[in-house]
Amino acid sequence: DNRYKQNYYAVNVYTDYSHSFGKHNGKVLLGLNYERYNQDNMWASGTDLTTEDKPFLSQTQSNKKNGDGYWNRATAGYDGKYLAEFNIRYDGSSRFLADKRWAWFPSVSLGWNIAREEFFEKLSETVNTLKLRGSWGQLGNTSSNYNSFWDWYPFYQQQAISSASSNWLINGEKQNTSSLPSIVNATMTWETVETWDFGFDFGAFNNRLTGTFDWYSRTTKDMIGPAPILGSVLGTNAPKTNNCDMRTSGWELEIGWRDQINDFKYGVRFNLSDNRSKILTYPYDGEFSNQSIGGYYNGKYLNEIWGYESVGLASSKVEMD
């Protein structure tokens, strides 16, 4: 039997209020989002049935993910020169157990449009926009490395049952067996992605020439990393844990030009970026027999290639000795 079904539902609702007085302006937004995901995937066949009196399949599972979020955003500005924004989110995910399911995530950003200042008037006809900005914020991440709830929480529903699969005989016949799932980590919770960002936007020649530049440092705290390898005497795998911190630093540059010749409009855009990810902390550094180039090592960049340094080649037996 082979069956597959997938459903995804998403609802976003928000309301806002704006008010201006003099050179001041402000805006407040309130919103919520609601997501439901359900996947049913089954392939099954049966041989050596323990009994034919119950012709049905057991231990079937579905993969469900639910997420709810509530957010608030407040913005304020003065004369198009000074800008501020504050955000707060309260997110919940069914990927975590009940007491670890919800968390708060704030962020704040500031901007300064220098092109609106009086001391910039001499250049304002050429440079229409020159905005400096900076921001700090946190977002929650549920980790994209493990898609199934059962990958995270292998409860008894995943206990495997096999017919006539034992390695020993009783009365000349192999016996039915069951195997325990992995250990459950009841403390697993959100990964917190904390980002610092500094950059500027510019526009010149009536905004025909535009560009942005950003430098950022993004730290993923309590990242769900590889579990340690435990002795085979345990009989199962170690549970996944929030055991790793990683920092990604990089920059992004974008420059564009758009113009019109008679009725012909055209535009070009150039993008350039670079970033590197570095493992800050990982408690099982160097303890895995299966660590490879893609493994986690404290203080090393992700996917960095490194190894032993050569001290030279021996050209005689004396040097070998």
For the regions a language model picked out, list residue spans one by one.
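Extracellular/periplasmic, surface-exposed regions of secreted and cell-surface proteins
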Residues: 1-309
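Short, intrinsically disordered, charge-balanced linker/junction segments flanking boundaries
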Residues: 316-321
